[in-house]
């Protein structure tokens, strides 16, 4: 009998709870849901477990506040941290969430040093670097969830504007997870037809694409302003689980994620959103695209912003 993979979710808030549910739906493995709020972790785990007879999914799930329970986890997704309130930027979260990540990273190093770690906590590009520095895990075993979500938002907005299925749209967003992300129009298409060609065909205007790019950059902020008391969690959870699935099942999907760069794109010792291939060995390849002068300028501005944010961690 094949042993189930052990997946630890650190943080049982909206995103953590949704990730746990999606993992069960997809039968990806057994789940440990950890939170300092013991009751929340145990309550959500029990609620999900009680849905198993209806959903016909197998595997164990339990909640805890004890880091020892993540021992020998195959993969870990970190969502713990305070979330944004209206008017608050991701950057406002830094001081509090770095301390949270530091504690988590120390315990991952102690109990699950061989795990593949996906960081979701914002501000993403700062938190994933903090995870790397404090856990001392290999750089190929730590990634941040950002580009998958940003690309999904961009694809959705394009699909709605063109009145086509979201399944027809492919897009790619690089750079930091914030206002200076870089949606790559040249690498975005609808059933193989580039956005540039769709503009030429009159199916969408350049101004509308520019508007969609800006809406994508403000995608998280838009949801925060609507919810008033929280931030997005359905799409972030789906994004993290897609990355997890690629690792656990060696799918080798090429996905835009925050990954550690060692000279690629001219960047050293930072986690930045770029296309990577995720397989059983973690980050198996960083795909280095040739950017235009304009794209490179935006990308470098994004990198500079990340450098400023991580200066004091």
UniProtKB/Swiss-Prot annotation:
Q: Which InterPro entries does the record match to this protein?
A: L-lactate/malate_DH, Lactate/malate_DH_C, Lactate/malate_DH_N, Lactate_DH/Glyco_Ohase_4_C, Malate_DH_type3, NAD(P)-bd_dom_sf
Question: What Enzyme Commission number(s) apply to this enzyme?
Answer: 1.1.1.37
Q: Where does substrate bind?
A: 84, 90, 122, 153
Q: Which residues form the active site?
A: 177 (proton acceptor)
GO BP terms: lactate metabolic process; tricarboxylic acid cycle
**What keywords tag this UniProt record?**
NAD, Oxidoreductase, Tricarboxylic acid cycle
The Gene Ontology terms for molecular function here are: L-lactate dehydrogenase activity; L-malate dehydrogenase (NAD+) activity
Keyword match Oxidoreductase: yes
Checking Pfam families in the record gives:
Ldh_1_C (PF02866), Ldh_1_N (PF00056)
The protein's matches in Gene3D superfamilies, at most eight in alphabetical order, are given as: Lactate dehydrogenase/glycoside hydrolase, family 4, C-terminal, NAD(P)-binding Rossmann-like Domain
Residues annotated to bind NAD(+): 11-16, 35, 97, 120-122
Q: Which reaction does it catalyse?
A: (S)-malate + NAD(+) = oxaloacetate + NADH + H(+)
Its family remark reads: Belongs to the LDH/MDH superfamily. MDH type 3 family.
HAMAP family tied to this protein: Malate_dehydrog_3
**NCBIfam families annotated for this entry?**
MalateDH_bact, PRK06223.1
Instruction: Give the protein's biological function.
Output: Catalyzes the reversible oxidation of malate to oxaloacetate.
Its protein name is Malate dehydrogenase
This chain's source organism reads: Ehrlichia ruminantium (strain Welgevonden)
Instruction: Print the organism lineage.
Output: Bacteria, Pseudomonadati, Pseudomonadota, Alphaproteobacteria, Rickettsiales
- What gene name does this entry carry? mdh
């Amino acid at each position: 009998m094949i042993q189930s993979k052990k997946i630890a979710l650190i943080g049982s808030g909206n995103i953590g709870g949704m990730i746990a549910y999606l993992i069960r739906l997809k039968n990806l493995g057994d789940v440990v849901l950890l939170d300092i709020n013991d009751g929340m972790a145990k309550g959500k785990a029990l609620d999900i477990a009680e849905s198993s007879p209806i959903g016909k999914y197998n595997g164990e799930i339990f909640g805890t506040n004890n880091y020892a329970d993540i021992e020998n986890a195959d993969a870990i997704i970190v969502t713990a941290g305070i979330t944004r309130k209206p008017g608050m930027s991701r950057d406002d979260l830094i001081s509090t969430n770095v301390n949270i990540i530091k504690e988590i990273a120390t315990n991952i190093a102690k109990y699950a040093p061989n795990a593949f770690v996906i960081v979701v906590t914002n501000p993403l590009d700062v938190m994933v670097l903090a995870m790397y520095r404090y856990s001392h895990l290999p750089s190929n075993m730590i990634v941040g969830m950002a580009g998958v979500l940003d690309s999904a938002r961009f694809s959705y907005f394009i699909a709605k504007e063109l009145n086509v299925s979201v399944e027809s749209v492919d897009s790619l967003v690089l750079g930091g997870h914030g206002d200076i992300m870089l949606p790559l129009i040249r690498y975005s298409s609808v059933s193989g037809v580039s956005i540039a060609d769709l503009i030429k065909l009159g199916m969408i205007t350049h101004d509308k694409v520019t508007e969609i790019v800006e809406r994508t950059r403000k995608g998280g902020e838009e949801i925060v302003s609507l919810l008033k008391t929280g931030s997005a969690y359905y799409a972030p959870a789906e994004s993290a689980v897609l990355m997890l699935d690629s690792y656990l099942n060696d799918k080798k999907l090429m996905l835009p994620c925050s990954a550690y760069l060692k000279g690629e794109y001219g960047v050293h010792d930072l986690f930045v959103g770029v296309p990577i291939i995720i397989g059983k060995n973690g980050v198996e390849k960083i795909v280095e695209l040739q950017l235009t002068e304009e794209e490179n300028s935006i990308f470098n501005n994004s990198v500079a912003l990340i450098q400023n944010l991580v200066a004091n961690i």
